[in-house]
Amino acid sequence: MKRFLKAWRKTSLIKKITIGVVIGLFLGILVPKASAIGLLGQLFVGGLKAIAPLLVFTLVISALSQHREGGKTNMSTIIGLYITATFAAALIAVVVNYIFPLTLILKTPAKTDLLPPKGISEVFQSLLLKIVDNPIHAITEANYMSILFWAVIFGLAMRSSNQRTKDLMQTFADATSQVVKWIINLAPIGIMGLVFTSISENGIAILGDYGLLILVLVGTMLFVALVVNPIIAFVMMRKNPYPLVLRCLKDSGITAFFTRSSAANIPVNMRLCEDLGLDKDTYSVSIPLGAAINMAGAAITINILTLAAVNTLGITVDFPTAFLLSVVAAVSACGASGVTGGSLLLIPVACSLFGISNDVAMQVVGVGFIVGVIQDSCETALNSSTDVLFTAVAEKSVFGKK
């Protein structure tokens, strides 16, 4: 037993997670009714979601209160990269539709009581109202736009505080970070539970009914992750981007895939940024901001499902209209965190461009919920891993350096 524990401690976290995935897969097939195993996954995700808002709040306040005048944070570059990548992903999804046009069987209404927004203006109105939420309520409800807003305000206000007060805030941030590390070390057990739940509840039958749709969605996201994002990174860094890209996918994308929550993956991304030696003043803000607005995966989902509906109804779409759809999808995706139901509930906004009725659009949303187990996992993995990628790329960029 001692030898086993010693070997386990020396094993890297990714290898431990891989072992957890394999065990969860077999347990889901062999003992699908052992629901207690799934509880481990719920506890893990719950722990990450519980600590993440406090982590963001304390880190941002601490970083801003001790920020040096004239210090460079690269935030404008990072936001530019977030927007560029989201639009590029939306455009790639349009191109994929021309190569692999999909059609859907629209006969089952969406199994959801959620109502889609009436337009982009409603999406951003909701987002703006969430920003000025009560800070205590924002932390308890994991409203990251509001958490960031108030953390920035408090951080700037604390710049004039004495050093002892700033050190106390830093100690609180360090203690929160330590709790996060303890929770992340439980990832192999938690992910084992998540894999078990996914396999025992959904099985693999979903692949047969919606295999082509899943293949196109996942394939497009992989293309963006392994081709488009590396091209953007190369343009910025002027060196081989793949070691960084693959590191982000391995250390951030894998956990995001199983937690299916950008918010829950914030602590994982913070730790990865620390391991990469990035500037804490920058990543303490860019990572939670990315979790809210960096939505390349959402843009892909919106465009592919919307254009599949267009193809199903026999509507002809010229490229200028498809380009406009890319703009709408990119803008809508950036506001996905302000909509209950995320990217799927923004599909009716995009469908409205083509005069598709809300009834039909909600049937498309229903198809999205059916493939959501795989779609949402891949979407979150792409979104969350690129938060770290573009934070690192901005810091390593050749532009602006003498």
Curated annotation (Swiss-Prot):
This is Serine/threonine transporter SstT. Belongs to the dicarboxylate/amino acid:cation symporter (DAACS) (TC 2.A.23) family. Its main location: membrane. InterPro entries: Na-dicarboxylate_symporter, Na:dicarbo_symporter_sf, Ser_Thr_transp_SstT. It is a multi-pass membrane protein. Keywords: Amino-acid transport, Cell membrane, Membrane, Symport, Transmembrane, Transmembrane helix, Transport. It comes from Streptococcus agalactiae serotype III (strain NEM316). It catalyses: L-serine(in) + Na(+)(in) = L-serine(out) + Na(+)(out); L-threonine(in) + Na(+)(in) = L-threonine(out) + Na(+)(out). The keyword Disulfide bond does not apply. HAMAP family: Ser_Thr_transp_SstT (MF_01582). It is found in: Cell membrane. One of its GO terms (cellular component) is plasma membrane. Involved in the import of serine and threonine into the cell, with the concomitant import of sodium (symport system). One of its GO terms (molecular function) is neutral L-amino acid:sodium symporter activity. The lineage of its organism: Bacteria, Bacillati, Bacillota, Bacilli, Lactobacillales.
